[in-house]
Structure formats: C-alpha cells, structure tokens
C-alpha cells in the first residue's frame, strides 16, 4: 500500500513539474506586454506603423495568457480546501504536499494564489509580474522564495503564515506592496530591495531574524504594530 501511495505521489509530482515547466517556459511576446495589453497601438510604440501585426501579436499574447492562467488556476484550486463550503477558513488541498518551482517565470497575466496551503518548498524566485499578484492568506510549512523578482503592478502577501525560511531580497516593486498581518517563524529577508510605491509590513510577528537592510523606499512605508522576537537588520536603507 505504501509503495502504491509513493508511486501515486511521484506521478502527481511529475504532473506538477510539467505544469510549472509550462508556466516557466519563455514566451517572446510577454516582454511587449505594456504595448499589447492596450486596445490599440501606442503612437510612440513599435507597432505604430503596423496595426495588423499589432492585432495578430495581441491576439497571440491574450490566447497564451489565457492558457497559462488556466494552468495556474488548476494548481491554485487544489492548494486549499474549504470544509463545509466555509470560504472564511481553509485546510490543505489535494496538491498541497507537492513541491512547486515557478522560478524565473514571466507572468503576463494576473496571478491569484490567495488562500493557498503549501506543505512543501515553493520557489517563485527571479519572476517578473506585469499584472497584479495576490498571495494573501496563505500558509507555507517549508521554505518559500520570492527573491530577485520584479513587480510592475500591485502585489499583496497580507495575512500569511511562514513556518520556514522566507525570502524576498533583491526585488523591485514599481507599485504598492503589502505584507501586513503576517507571522514569520523562520528567517525572513527583504534586504536589497527597491519599493517604488507604498509598502506596509505592519501588524506582523517575527520569531527569527528579519533583514530589511540596503533597501530604498520611495513611497509611503509602514512597520507599525509589529513584534520582533529575533534580530532585525535595517542599516543602509533610505
């Protein structure tokens, strides 16, 4: 029975790996998201003299975005379960026990991973988000990596619990970022980051070391009401 269970688990991990590999795979038009997400070509953009190519490329981008977003949705809905249909509380889902590697993905569509429960390690390092990203209300039992990423739209990590190491270091936020009402049991790093919009870390609890050093804050910033049980590093920040 255990061997059968192990075999099923291996099969499940292969399915997850394939879905993640597809989401990670390069798509050339993704880097033209700013232009192609508009209804018509920009007068100063690369399609200003070729409206037909704009229409073709826009349709391609939207179609690919739809497929990738659907793949992410299929993962997301299996990362939590609502007992008795109660949307206010959730438990782990049927796919919560697998490892997830989304590293270096380019998300040219909104990312909605809120209320997810991960029992294994998760890697979102080196990612680029052209649209909004929602990770609020999530539980991470092991390590999670969001480091070296770029967010062009808003991103929310509110009301989450991290039992292992959590990394956001080396990231750039062009819009607002939220990390409020969260609990960190392991080491957490936000150092060497740039916050172009407002950012809030308030009402959070840190049990281990927290690193915020060498960062730049260009918008409104909040650390109110947080409790730090471990060391805090905040030097060389402006």
Task: Give residue ranges: language-model regions.
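N-terminal leader/targeting and pre-domain segments
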Residues: 3-238
């Amino acid at each position: 029975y255990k061997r059968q269970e192990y075999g099923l688990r291996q099969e499940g991990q292969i399915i997850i790996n394939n879905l993640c590999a597809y989401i990670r795979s390069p798509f050339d038009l993704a880097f033209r998201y700013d232009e192609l997400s508009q209804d018509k070509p920009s007068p100063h953009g690369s399609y200003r003299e070729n409206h037909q190519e704009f229409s073709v490329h826009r349709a391609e981008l939207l179609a690919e975005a739809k497929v990738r977003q659907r793949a992410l949705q299929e993962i997301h809905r299996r990362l939590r379960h609502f007992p008795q249909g109660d949307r206010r509380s959730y438990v782990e889902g049927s796919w919560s026990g697998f490892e997830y590697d989304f590293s270096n993905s380019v998300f040219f569509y909104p990312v909605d991973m809120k209320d997810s429960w991960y029992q294994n390690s998760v890697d979102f390092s080196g990612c680029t988000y052209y649209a909004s990203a929602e990770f609020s209300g999530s539980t991470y039992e092991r390590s999670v990596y969001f480091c070296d990423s770029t967010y062009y739209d808003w991103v929310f990590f509110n009301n989450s619990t991290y039992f292992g190491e959590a990394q956001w270091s080396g990231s750039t936020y062009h819009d607002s970022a939220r990390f409020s009402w969260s609990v960190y049991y392991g080491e957490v790093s936000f150092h060497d980051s740039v916050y172009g919009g407002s950012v809030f870390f308030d009402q959070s609890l840190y049990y281990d070391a927290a690193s915020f050093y060498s960062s730049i804050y260009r918008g409104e910033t909040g650390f109110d009401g947080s409790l730090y049980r471990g060391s805090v590093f905040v030097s060389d920040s402006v």
